[in-house]
């Protein structure tokens, strides 16, 4: 869901050429699987195109290649840190909801986990969390000067 939401926001802002967005699993349970039907349905309901993909395992090379690695929950963060060798030496690993509200506070929050629809069945809540995190991430990049401050990020 997060890959599709962030891709959609970036496209709306005409920033496609400034981003490479990908997603990867931090555990092996879903390797090779497409997005869950609940995710597909929620994205369709919100008129957000699904980025077609099948789950792949995150690797240490991802850490070396990408500028940011964003996990949805504490377990993701632990797994990501383990995969990259036990330490986030380049300060690239973040929890999605640490960005939520960044536009108001200009600082990271003590973020809770994104609501996991695997347990809750509530794709609406997950979607709201993901949108808040993605928008906050874009505000963060804007404050850092990585994207223009003149670009208006949708509320």
Regions found by a protein language model. Name each.
Residues 68, 74, 78-155:
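Phosphate-binding/catalytic loops
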Residues 1-66, 140-155:
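Conserved active-site segments centered on acidic
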Residues 1, 73-74:
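Short secondary-structure boundary segments
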């Amino acid at each position: 869901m997060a890959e599709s939401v962030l891709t959609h926001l970036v496209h709306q802002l005409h920033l496609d050429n400034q981003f490479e967005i990908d997603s990867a699993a931090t555990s092996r349970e879903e390797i090779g699987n497409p997005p869950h039907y609940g995710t597909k349905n929620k994205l369709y309901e919100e008129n957000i195109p699904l980025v077609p993909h099948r789950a792949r395992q995150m690797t240490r090379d991802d850490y070396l290649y990408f500028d940011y690695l964003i996990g949805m929950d504490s377990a993701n963060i632990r797994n990501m840190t383990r995969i990259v060798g036990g330490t986030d030496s380049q300060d690239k690993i973040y929890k999605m909801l640490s960005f939520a509200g960044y536009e108001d506070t200009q600082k990271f929050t003590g973020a809770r986990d994104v609501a996991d629809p695997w347990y809750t069945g509530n794709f609406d809540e997950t979607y709201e969390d993901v949108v808040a995190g993605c928008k906050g991430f874009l505000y963060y990049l804007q404050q850092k000067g990585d994207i223009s401050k003149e670009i208006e990020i949708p509320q």
